Amino acid sequence: MITLDLTLPDCRYPIHIGQGVLDRAGELVAPHLPQSRALIVTNDVVAPLYLERCRQSLQAAGVCTEVVILPDGEAHKDWQTLNCIFDALIAMRAERKTALVALGGGVIGDMTGFAAACWQRGAPFVQIPTTLLAQVDSSVGGKTAINHPAGKNMIGAFWQPRVVLADLDVLDTLPEREFSAGLAEVYKYGLIDNLPFFEWCEQQVPALLARDKAALAHAVEVSCRMKAAIVGQDEKEQGVRALLNLGHTFGHAIEAGLGFGVWLHGEAVAAGMVLAAETAQEMGQLESADVLRIRALLLQSNLPVVPPAWPLATWLELMGHDKKVEGGQLRFVLPDRLGHCRLESGVGEKYLEKVLIHNIRD
């Protein structure tokens, strides 16, 4: 097992990565809880696979647990489903020190964290991510939210977990499409600030797709280490943390425009990263050969590289709800070379139109 620490001015918490971590949930989680009571929040896909193992481990460590099982999918990341968590907390007479344990992917983690941030103005919570995307990205860093019909993650809070458990073994049951979606977020780290890691990913696609445990351990560790370092510098996304949104301005627009859940988050980010790279190319910041390498890596990993065919006005309306908008102006994370990105304001519509029309014609 590998243990990383994320250190912030007001808190510090461990990220445990390895095989068999879920069965050690009790010993790894209990020391971080202020009270020996917890609500496990999971979904109807994960529950039959991992709920009892998680619950038994926590109870063996003296943590009394209740459970709420939510419907699976991005389409349920809303107020109605969030209220199911609050109803369960009320039914169990939860207190401010009662912990919430997120057992699931990014949707479960985001909603559980937001519920914890809201419950009696702040309750402890734990992340036990069961998807690759959640293990390498959404479970680390304290971003919590639900969606609004107008946009992705529009309603939320920064609320850090007490501990994160990333069990590589649970990835064995992940559907291929969801596994590939997680790889998009892995590759993102190489693109924003780690060229050697990007090159390693290019070489390791077969091993990653085969879910080789050594390759997965390295991918998850590097991703979490990079995210922990960035969040440690900029918890509330006032500066460098914005770089983690590479591909997300386009990607969130795709998710909202198609309807949440039609494309997986990682699929939308993959297409968004290609659009960001092609925008940078049009602006003269990125070589065409680098764009081709990005596209090739994503295609090898069974990820989409062509966005929906929408008019520019539709894109601009959808992207106008992006959380990086400042002073009414869109801001994009764009690569200027492989392994390096920067935040750009004032990207001309002529570049966006050319890139989007180019993709539509493809």
UniProtKB/Swiss-Prot annotation:
The keyword Cytoplasm applies. Zn(2+) binds at residues 185, 248, 265. Pathway: Metabolic intermediate biosynthesis; chorismate biosynthesis; chorismate from D-erythrose 4-phosphate and phosphoenolpyruvate: step 2/7. CDD domains: DHQS. InterPro entries: Dehydroquinate_synthase, DHQ_synth_AroB, DHQ_synth_fam, DHQS/DOIS_N, DHQS_C. Its main location: cytoplasm. One of its GO terms (biological process) is amino acid biosynthetic process. NAD(+) binds at residues 72-77, 106-110, 130-131, 143, 152. It is an enzyme of class 4 (lyase). Its EC number is 4.2.3.4. The keyword Signal does not apply. Its cofactor is Co(2+); Zn(2+); NAD(+). It is found in: Cytoplasm. It comes from the Bacteria. Binds 1 divalent metal cation per subunit. Can use either Co(2+) or Zn(2+). One of its GO terms (cellular component) is cytoplasm. GO terms for molecular function: 3-dehydroquinate synthase activity; metal ion binding; nucleotide binding. It catalyses: 7-phospho-2-dehydro-3-deoxy-D-arabino-heptonate = 3-dehydroquinate + phosphate. Keywords: Amino-acid biosynthesis, Aromatic amino acid biosynthesis, Cobalt, Cytoplasm, Lyase, Metal-binding, NAD, Nucleotide-binding, Zinc. PANTHER family: 3-DEHYDROQUINATE SYNTHASE, 3-DEHYDROQUINATE SYNTHASE, CHLOROPLASTIC. Catalyzes the conversion of 3-deoxy-D-arabino-heptulosonate 7-phosphate (DAHP) to dehydroquinate (DHQ). Belongs to the sugar phosphate cyclases superfamily. Dehydroquinate synthase family. This is 3-dehydroquinate synthase. The lineage of its organism: Bacteria, Pseudomonadati, Pseudomonadota, Betaproteobacteria, Neisseriales.
